[in-house]
Structures are given as C-alpha cells and as structure tokens.
Amino acid sequence: MKKNLTMLILASSIASIGISSTVIAQENLPYQKPPQSILALADVERAPAVSMDSKKNVMLLTYRSTFKTLNELNQSEMRLGGLRINPVTNISSSVNYINNLKLRKVSDSVEQQVKGLPKDALITNLTWSPNEKKIAFTHTTSNAVELWVIDVASAQAKRLSTAKLNANLDNPFIWFKDSENLLVKVLPKNRPALLDSSKDLPTGAIISNADGSVSQNRTYPDLLKNRNDEINFENIASSELHKVNINGTSSLWKKADMYSGESFSPDGKLVMLTTIQKPFSYIVPVNRFPSKTIVTDLSGKPIKTVNEVPLTETMPKGFSATREGKRNMVWRADKPASLSYVVALDGGDPAKKVDYRDEVFSWDAPFDQAPKSLIKTAQRFSNIIWGNDKLAVITDSWYDTRNEKTYFFNPSNPAEKARLVFDRNSQDIYANPGRFETKRNQYDRRVLAIEDNKAYLIGAGHSKKGQFPFIDAMQIDSLEKTRLYQSTYTDKIENIQSIEDFAKGDVLVQIQSKNEYPNFFFRNIKNNQLNAITQFKNPYEGLKDVSKEVIKYTRKDGVQLSGTLYLPAGYDKSKKEKLPLLIWAYPAEFKDKDSAGQSTHNPNAFTAPSYGSFIYWATRGYAVLDDAAFPIIGEGNTEPNDNFVPQLVDNAEAAIDAVDALGYIDRKRVAVGGHSYGAFMTANLLTYSKLFACGIARSGAYNRTLTPFGFQREQRNYWEVPEVYTKMSPFMNADKMKTPILLVHGEADNNPGTFTLQTERYFQALKGLGAPARMVILPKESHGYAAKENILHLLWEQDQFLEKCLKK
C-alpha cells in the first residue's frame, strides 16, 4: 500500500452508533473531501502576513499557500539529535515556505510585486538589513538553499551567491552592521557523503550506561541512536562561515565547524560564535549537547572564549530547574560590546533552600577584566529589558507558586537596592499590568522606552467586563501610573502593537471584529484620529451569518467558566430547535480558583477557523462551543492533577448544562473533541462519564507510564504518584470505555510524549476490549497537520463520524 495515495484506517465494529455491524478491521481508502460548506471555508486563500521597517515607512507583504502538498511532506528526511532536516537541501523538513513577496509604502496602498523572484519560490529566513534598505532571504531549490537579497527601493530581487547554504541549524546568515555584507553558513567544500546504514550489518551492540546520577528526562523524539547517527549529525551540523557582499563577492571567513549561533555586538565590531561540541548524546536533543562560545573580531580572529557548556543529560526535577554554569548569554542592548549572562546560585535545583536563585553578570569587551555582578534574584530569572546606564527592568518567577516579580534596578550600581515594580500571579490576566514598551537606540537595538522620566506599558486589557487594551505611562521615580489611552470598542478588538511617536501620540494598532479581518491602523491617542494602513478582506464569508456569543457559566464548585458558542446561520433562538452540540477544549492547570475563572474569550475576535476547528460544523447544523474553559485547579500543596478526572467531568457537565439551559441543544447528542492534551482530555471524558455520545481525539497520549518523568504541567514522576498516572491514563482504563471514539494521529509525530505509538496501542486496547473505535493515521504528518490531502480527509472523517454519531 502506498501511503502517499491512501489512508490506513482501522476500526472495530461500531453498530451501536449506526454504522454497519460488519465493519472491516482495515480499509484502504483513497483521500476524501468534506462537504462543500466545510470545503469552501477550509480551502481559502490566505491574506498576506505583514512585516514593516522600524520607521513604519515600508511594508513587506508575504504570501503562503494555505496548505502544503503531500508531495512536500514526502521529501527526503533525516532525524538526528531532535532535528528533522532534508539531507538533500540542508534545511528543516518542516519549513512553511513563502511563495510570493510584495512591497508597498505604508503611506499609500500601491503594492509593488517584487521582481526577479525565483520561479516556484520557496522563501524563508526574511531579514531586513540594519539600514533597512535591503531584505535578505533564502530560497530552497531541489538540491540546495540559496542566498537572495531584495533592494527595497526598486523592489528588485537577485541571487547573491551560488554557494549551497547550511540551514540545518536555523537561519544560515546574519547581516554585518554595515548592511553591505552578510555572515553566511555554507556547506564545507569537501563535505563527506552522509552514511546510509540501513542495509549494513551491525558491528556491535549499542550500549548506554547509568552512573547513578538522577536524570529525569522527557521522552524526546528523533534522538541519535548509534555511531553512524553521530557521524551524520556532525556532517549536517558543520558549516564554513563566509563573508558575502551584496555585490555577490564572497570569501571564507572561518573554517568549518558546528556553528549553532552567531551574533554581532551592538556596535558591530565583534562577533559572538557558538559551536556544538562533543560528546553527543543518545538521550537528549541538540540543545543540550556541549557547546563553546567565543568572541572574535570582524576578521574572525578569536578574542576570548566566554563560555563552555558541558553535556547536560542530568537536570534537577521541576519546571523551575535549570542547568549550572553561565546561561542566557547575550549582548547587552544598551552597551556597544558587553555580554550579560545568568548563573544559578542553587545549582539549578528548585528543591534547595537558598536566599537567591540566580545572579546576573555583565562582562565588558575585551573581556580581560572579571565580569561584574549586577543583581541577584530571589526567584528564577525570566528576562531583562535593558534601558540606560541607570535603569533596567528584570523579572523573576517561580512555577510552583505562579508568582512573578518585576524590578527596576541600576546596572551601574549593584549596591543600589532594586525597586519592586510588580508582584503578581502570572496567571491573573485581569491584573496584568501589560508589557513595557521598547524603542530602538543608537545601536539599533530595542531598549526600554524612556520619555520625560516615564516608562510605558501596553496591556491587553482583559477584565470581567470585556477586553479594553490600554497604554499607561509610569513615573520611574514614584511608580505612579497614568492611563494615556484605553480602547472603548464594544463591537471590535483594538490590539495595540507599538508606540510610534511619543510626542505626537501616534500608535500602531490592529483592529478586528467577528467578520472584519484584522487590519493595521495608525491611531493618534491625542486627537483620536484613525488612519487605515491595510484593507485585507474576510476570506470566510460563509461564516458571516453564523451566530457567535461568549457564554459564561459556573462549575458546581463555584469556578467561573466560559466558551464561545456558535449557532448555525438562520437559527431561530426563540423556537429553540434542539441541535447536536460539539465541544472543543484543552485543559489548563491553575493554582487558584480566581485565576482559573478569568476569561480571555471575546465575541469580537475575528472568526477564522483553523484546520483543526469544530467551527466548520456550524454550517452543518451543529451548535459549537469552542475553546470551552477546562481548568484543573490544585490549591496550596495540592497539585492540579491530584483531582484531574473529577474536575474534567465537572467542566464538561457545566458546559453542557449551560448550553442546555439556553434551550438550544439535545443533551443526548453531544460530542467532545481535542488535539494533543485535548485528545487526552477527550479519552478521559469518554472513559469516566456518560455525558457524551462520542468523541474525537487527535494526536494524543493515552498511556502516562510511557511519559514517566512528567507530562504537560506535571512535575512529579510516575514512581512518586503512580495512582495519579494510572487514573489519568485512558489506556490503563480502556476496559471502562464504551463510547464511540475517532482516534487520529500523524504518522510521524515529533512532539515529546505523543508518539504515534500512543494512539496505535490505545486503539488496539479498545478493539481488544470491544469498544467502538476508529483510528486514522495521516501519512507523513507530524504533531500538527500540514498537507492539503490529509487535512481535507481529516475534515471528511470528522464529518462522517459526527453525522453517524449525532444525527442518525
């Protein structure tokens, strides 16, 4: 059977839901398409994405196909060190390419087609030059990745070099500060051929050792497995660094090595280079392999080795854990050539009791003096926004408490006490003060925007009454805040993107409504003038008359819940015709009921169904409760998963009760669905409740003993709480499952913990125990689905399943 032409579908007898009692165990079924009402919404041309220069003078419009083709997914692929790459072209095999580019001035609506683009363009890695007069990008041919550049003024593209780039470890180039040259990763001249050991006889056993150290790692996919994998990994990771001028001339800048990171200092005079080192690992991916970081001058001459990181196979337990040694090493945005980095003071172990968890250092070029300690954090370091010599913003956080603290500190005077700015629950969205606005400095790096001794905050503005985004000014000395602007829309959403001119009050915003595609505008917050920048049209006209509202309801323990309810176009709410209901959800963990009860649902959000959405079925006569809140709460010393199943069922019951109370549904005809952890949720709901007629579970994990060192937000391992893992595992409780389920999985799932084997074994258990189930394996797909053929067939499968479950 050729998997690129047919589907592998397994099903047991499911006569109980109206399907023939003589269902065959395996079908070879050609690809199908969903009904026209769904197809018209799924197969639409997308509006372009927008990239603007920093001055908001020029706009780059980037166009992509709505789907990949199965042929694109059928490319050569090599899986090494957690990477999936095409060994022929030397770029990630999962890239979602751009196929066309246009330029336009922000001040007018005239679009210029970029001329000279390659035929059948496969564009990615778009990067503006520092002076924003050029845009570099890569184009992938049938056997290589090429470097191209666009002249913005003329909208003309040209290929810069015939060299084959190495994009296996992300973007293969960066701009020099002069905007005339690029530092480019090129395949080595004498690169050896990759080894194909598929037909070789083994030369010995594969042996791994445990030295007694605790090493609790997640179930990573695509790891190295043998010596040949190691050789091939070194091969695909190795590059020469070339200096390429925009006139097309090129010279070798640094000999071949496994370069994994390159960045120029803000003044453009130094380069920080990181290389992967040996030994490699068979149990962790490339981001935990050893590495070495050096700083060089502009000729590539080494100045200083600034960091060496050993292989990190062993890590303390917990989401606030980290490794020992220097980490988060970056150039300071506010200095010409200074590095900053963080060191754990607790060995990276959250279980240790210490006064301070992390220490932040600054190290000035040429790195011949000792680094300077700037500040210590009581919790785990999160991030820094550099400002000027006397002001920077630092945030630390702690997962177990969900606490997050933000401070102002003086990077020039470590003795000066940091000032607490915010002390908050990171999950309390109603009290979120917003993000500090940044602006470009003299080095063209983004730093804290400071005007008249004020910093500025841009917030999403979620509240009990709705969503009203805002801009606040904060006095740096007193921390007193003044609201400069707050959106008043009740029929639209105005998301604030950036402050463009502090003196004039010009702000870039994006406005959308249920039926209006998100478009960019300039808003003047002083005179309230609004000027449109883009005019993208709604490609989902088939949904314009579908009823959409946010409903709020209460779980039996008092927790407030919400979801977005869609009803078919023309549905008469007064007649209360009983519709089948579809619920789509994804569980989320919380440490308190107040945070769990907060809602980010907004009825004014543009209705744009993804391939995975249930919203399509509003056109097929179903009521749809989308993104229904499914909080799992563990207060105090109780972990959320200690009561996972009861809360899951309570969430579902509350959702059904709420829609039923409106009079719209037949509660005997309700289906539930979810993807990934939502699929796990679905299987548990069908196992432990009788609320649903059927369910759809996509790309889930069903046996938690196969993820023994934690999953999702669970930090404890299986041996600490075997009863929790067992209770939460649908596979372990498959004998209780009697409700029809459609199981879908990508054949090549690359997500930790959701290997395709999870669905295959769960289906075998259900089939063996006589449960009604159907399994669909989508060829070539990973955790998210991409190929048009597979996605349209998925929609057909779901429609067939729901029609048989809920309408017959």
Q: Predicted regions span which residues?
A:
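Beta-propeller folds
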Residues: 10-14, 18, 24-518, 522-529, ...
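Active-site-proximal cap/loop segments of hydrolase catalytic domains
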Residues: 92, 97-102, 106, 588, ...
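Short beta-strand element of the alpha/beta-hydrolase
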Residues: 576-588
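Bacterial N-terminal signal peptides that target proteins for export
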Residues: 1-9
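Conserved hydrophobic/aromatic pocket- or pore-lining residues that grip, position, or stack substrates
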Residues: 293, 339, 421, 520, ...
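Secondary-structure transition/capping motifs at alpha-helix termini
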Residues: 296-301, 365-368, 398-401, 409-416, ...
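N-terminal cap/lid segment of alpha/beta-hydrolase-fold proteins
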Residues: 534-577
